[in-house]
A protein has these predicted regions:
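Residues at alpha-helix caps and immediate loop-helix transition turns in enzyme cores, especially N-
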Residues: 20-21, 71, 104-105, 135-138
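Short histidine/acidic/glycine/proline-rich micro-motifs that form metal-
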Residues: 12-15, 65, 96-101, 126-132
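A short beta-strand-loop structural module common to alpha/beta enzyme folds
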Residues: 34-45
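Glycine-rich phosphate/pyrophosphate-binding loop and the adjoining helix
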Residues: 29-31, 47, 119-155
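Conserved beta-strand termini and adjacent loop/short-helix elements that scaffold enzyme active sites
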Residues: 9, 41-43, 123
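Helix-loop-strand module that forms the ligand-binding subsite of alpha/beta enzymes
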Residues: 43-120
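Short helix-capping segments at alpha-helix termini
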Residues: 28-35, 84-86
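N-terminal beta1-alpha1 ligand-phosphate binding loop
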Residues: 2-31
Length: 155
């Protein structure tokens, strides 16, 4: 069986957001998941082919002025047209580290991915307010759930 690729694109400008990104990777690389290759990239390092060659993606962003991080938006700007015809139905999930409510960021991501015709496979994870250690277990669970679903052929 060919290994499936799960791409994790995470904007992690702080120690806490780096911990969250690492927790997503930790969940996705659970040793019981056998046929999934996890590739984690920063937004600036992500190219259209990274998305096109993946079977699913998890996007992590901060909420910046009620919107997604500029570097995450840059990924969509650079990858939108190269991916548009090649990734329709593409399974994805995302998490937001929101100092406030995260709804503007969520709407923006959902708007762009609707245009791409991607398929949201998990409710968005909104980590709101002051940082809580529970965010890490939620992020780990997100990575585990998406990778296990990909491994099992559910997505």
């Amino acid at each position: 069986m060919n290994r499936k690729k799960l791409l994790i694109i995470a904007h992690a400008p702080s120690e806490n957001t780096k911990k969250m990104a690492d927790a997503v990777v930790k969940g996705a690389t659970n040793p019981e998941i056998e046929d999934v290759e996890v590739v984690s990239k920063a937004p600036l390092d992500t190219q259209p082919d990274d998305i096109i060659t993946a079977q699913a993606v998890i996007i992590g962003t901060t909420e910046n002025l009620g919107y997604m991080a500029g570097l995450v938006k840059d990924v969509f700007d650079r990858c939108y047209y190269p991916c548009l015809e090649k990734t329709q139905g593409f399974p994805f999930a995302f998490y937001i580290r929101a100092g406030h409510d995260g709804t503007g960021t969520q709407r923006a991501i959902e708007s762009i991915t609707t245009g791409l015709k991607w398929r949201l496979i998990q409710e968005p994870l909104l980590c709101r307010g002051d940082f809580q250690e529970d965010f890490l277990s939620q992020c780990e669970n997100l990575g585990l759930t998406v990778a296990a679903s990909l491994d099992a052929g559910i997505i």
